[in-house]
């Protein structure tokens, strides 16, 4: 998949060419990354390896992984090069000691499935809180140059009217709902980052990512955007288990990587930044209809296909209530960042890397 794929190689080159990313700050630096084998982590590590190999930005990447063999498979094409990537085997609850000085930490590891939040709320809280505390301590002891926590738009809670949501928006989260373990602990970790910045001088920041997808998804990815694409590619109806009324922005994987690096290197310590493509705002149903009618689905997969709503399997626990999440990204844009891919492009490029 890596740079042998035209789409993925183009993504890596676009990230490397982003003039607003101060790449020189990463020269001869070591980055510690969690969530390495996930969609965002994979794209992030790929981009860092790319600039190291092809853009004369010497750096080191240390990735925390649970299963070294699976990680080797995930990154096999990168490992076949001279890319400066090595693995530390452990999990978020038991992060092993790292002997090298760590200059930057990007904490992207976390459970991400709604079903997991609902069925394992205690573990959701403890894994996030323990891992963040451990890594912030690591940053403090190393006097690291930067720490970035990958947070979520879910920290804003349920917003039931259409309005722009900036970083100062105070949304409501019902703490008595177990599934809300996820947004609540994300809020707590954001606060912890701000506190470490204030009390200990750790340059910790948070980035609130909207739902992100694009090149680099795994074959078995079961998230909604992947389900929609798989159904359309197999010429099957796209079946939804809610009315799909929730509206939000989306973000392409490469745009997420450039946003992460921008906040890590140029963001202000103790602050949070929204990351989304404001032009890719739509309902889940509208997103499904977009996929069903993509040109690539018509041309290569005998499309279009139909969108069907079947709420018979929805017990009300697995899906958050209908809401609106239109993130305001002016604060991030002031650092020079901008999104580059619209919704149709996101899906088209994702599908072209799934083939």
Where do the model's predicted regions map?
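Conserved Rossmann-fold NAD(P)-dependent oxidoreductase catalytic core, especially the SDR/UDP-sugar
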Residues: 133-180
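Active-site segment of SDR-like NAD(P)-dependent oxidoreductases
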Residues: 111-115, 153-160, 210-213
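C-terminal substrate-binding subdomain of Rossmann-fold SDR/epimerase-dehydratase oxidoreductases
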Residues: 1-4, 232, 236-355
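Active-site helix of classical SDR
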Residues: 181, 185-188
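NAD(P)-dependent short-chain dehydrogenase/reductase
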Residues: 159-168, 191-248, 253-264, 284, ...
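NAD(P)H-binding glycine-rich loop region in Rossmannoid oxidoreductase-like domains
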Residues: 89-127
């Amino acid at each position: 998949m890596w740079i042998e794929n035209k789409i993925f190689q183009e993504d890596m080159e676009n990230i490397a060419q982003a003039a607003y990313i101060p790449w020189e700050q990463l020269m001869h630096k070591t980055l510690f990354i969690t969530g390495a084998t996930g969609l965002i982590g994979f794209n992030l590590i790929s981009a860092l390896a790319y600039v190291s190999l092809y853009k004369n930005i010497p750096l080191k990447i240390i990735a925390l992984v649970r299963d070294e063999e699976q990680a080797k498979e995930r990154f096999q094409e990168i490992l076949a090069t001279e890319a400066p990537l090595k693995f530390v085997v452990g999990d978020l609850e038991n992060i092993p000691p790292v002997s090298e000085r760590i200059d930057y930490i990007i904490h992207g590891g976390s459970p991400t499935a709604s079903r997991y939040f609902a069925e394992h709320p205690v573990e959701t809280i403890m894994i996030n809180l323990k891992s963040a505390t451990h890594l912030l301590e690591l940053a403090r002891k190393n006097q690291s140059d930067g720490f970035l926590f990958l947070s979520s738009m879910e920290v804003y809670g349920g917003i039931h009217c259409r309005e722009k949501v900036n970083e100062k928006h105070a949304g409501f989260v019902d703490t008595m709902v177990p599934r809300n373990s996820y947004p609540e602990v994300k809020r707590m970790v954001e606060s912890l980052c701000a506190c470490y910045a204030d009390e200990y001088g750790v340059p910790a920041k948070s980035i609130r990512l909207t739902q992100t997808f694009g090149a680099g998804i795994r074959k078995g990815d079961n998230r909604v955007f992947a389900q929609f694409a798989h159904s359309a590619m197999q010429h099957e109806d796209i079946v939804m288990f809610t009315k799909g009324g929730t509206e939000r922005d989306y973000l392409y994987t490469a745009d997420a990587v450039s946003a992460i690096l921008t906040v890590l290197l140029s963001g202000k310590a103790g602050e949070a930044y929204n990351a989304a493509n404001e032009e890719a705002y739509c309902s889940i149903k509208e997103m499904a209809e977009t996929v069903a009618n993509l040109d690539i689905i018509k041309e290569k997969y005998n499309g279009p296909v139909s969108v069907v709503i079947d709420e018979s399997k929805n017990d009300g626990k697995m899906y958050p209530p209908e809401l609106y999440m239109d993130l305001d990204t002016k604060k991030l844009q002031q650092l020079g960042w901008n999104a580059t891919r619209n919704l149709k492009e996101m899906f088209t490029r994702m599908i072209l890397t799934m083939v």
